[in-house]
Regions:
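Bacterial N-terminal signal peptides
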Residues: 7-15
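Extracellular hydrolytic enzyme modules, especially secreted metalloproteases
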Residues: 263-265, 269-395
């Protein structure tokens, strides 16, 4: 029975092409143009996502402000003229606009859109998963934009080499002081590197290697690649590979000789849309995409991952100092490149019996454990078994 269940699991995993990080489940505080602070919640993932106030009012972001949303006859959202406020600061006109929101209509639209988006990504396009044994090598490209640079500047390479493959006993790397919030507060630092996490999970059987290059400045703005619901990640991966091509021999990253680079990972300057509350930021994700991102040194780039430099969003970083990203998001998306699926619903689960593991599993909300993913939840026994890193006793 166990072997049958595992076979079904791998079959299901094989039909999914694109994965994305779950939205951060906590409160994100943003600052409106009138000087007020607004508490925002993020829902969904890269395929379909939306924003509400802390008490569930639907929002639309336009420019630098978050507005109370109007529900159209199709279930879509558009901004009203009312800047949103927390419940204790609303005037009567805002309350009237809120009462007109049709949550049921929007929920139906959200379910349809999320299902359609995921169906469009169906199919693994013959792209193999990244190996989950031994010491396979992945290429990591650091990129910044015309309007957004790494807080650590040219030292970003040193910072992210430590992030990916440093030892927990190592001193903080040169450049880490740029992340003032993490530098000054030990509770806002990673408790180990990505390599540490997978070494611990596999009991030493799996030690992925990460070659870090860059940072490279791309010609476009961050908004060009984020674009809210018009996510332009394909262009981000392609442009990053083109920028790195002069320095990288991509053929070194095709270990099995199938003509495809085993994995290219992009770490970009700025914030993740899954945590920032800004839908124009880029959403961390991974997958084989919908085709090749180009051919470099005779090898096609197909399997990719995307990760942000910083944790949370602009407002929190301005208040508490810049916060380096937690390894949790990276470990979650990297686990997708190994073949593990998401274990969370992306639409309103109020009509179903939600038995998801939430913060107890890396592939659900456990990517954000400990102040935003600085000490992510370990793999579950099922995930360890699927990866071949443990042999549970059958009862």
């Amino acid at each position: 029975m166990k072997k049958i269940l595992l076979s079904i699991t791998f079959a299901l995993m094989g039909i999914v092409s694109g994965f994305a990080a779950k939205a951060y489940s906590g409160i994100v505080t943003v600052t409106q143009s009138d000087g007020t602070e607004l508490n925002v919640r993020i829902y969904g993932d890269e395929h379909f996502n939306w924003l509400t106030t802390e008490d569930g009012v639907l929002l639309v972001k336009e420019g630098n402000n978050y507005y109370i949303a109007e529900t159209t006859s199709y279930g879509t959202l558009k901004a009203t003229k009312f800047i949103a406020h927390n419940a204790n600061k609303r005037v009567s006109a805002e309350i009237k606009a809120i009462k007109k929101q049709n949550h049921s209509r929007f929920r139906s639209y959200a379910i349809e859109q999320a299902s359609t988006a995921k169906a469009m990504g169906t199919g693994n396009n013959g792209v193999k998963y990244f190996p989950h044994s031994g010491s396979p090598k992945a290429l990591v490209i650091l990129v910044e934009f015309s309007d957004t640079t790494f807080q650590s500047g040219e030292k970003a390479k040193t910072v992210f080499e430590h992030f990916l493959k440093g030892n927990v006993e190592d001193a903080l790397p040169d450049g880490y002081e740029a992340y003032t919030g993490s530098y000054m507060n030990k509770n806002l630092r990673n408790k180990g590197s990505v390599s540490d996490y997978f070494y611990d999970m596999s009991k030493g059987a799996y030690t992925p290697l990460f070659d870090v290059v860059g940072p490279y400045k791309l010609n476009h703005s961050s908004l060009y690649y984020g674009q809210g619901d018009k996510d332009n990640t394909d262009a981000l991966v392609s442009d990053a590979c083109k920028a790195a091509d002069k320095d990288v021999d991509f053929s070194r990253y095709d270990a099995d000789g199938d003509g495809m680079v085993d994995l290219v990972y992009i770490i970009y300057a700025g914030y993740p849309a899954s945590m920032s509350g800004n839908p124009n930021d880029i959403w961390p994700q991974s997958g084989p995409g919908n085709g090749s991102f180009g051919t470099y040194d005779g090898k096609q780039v197909c399997r990719f991952g995307v990760h942000a430099e910083l944790n949370f969003g602009w407002a929190l970083n301005q208040k508490n100092g810049f916060l380096l990203s937690g390894i949790g998001l990276f470990c979650h998306e990297f686990s997708h490149t190994l073949g593990l699926p998401d274990l969370y619903p992306t639409v309103d689960a109020s009509k179903v019996d939600n038995q998801n593991p939430e913060m107890w599993d890396l592939m659900d909300g456990g990517e954000y454990t400990y102040n935003g993913g600085y000490c992510p939840t370990p793999y579950s026994p099922w995930e360890l078994d699927v990866m071949g890193w443990t042999s549970p006793v059958e009862l």
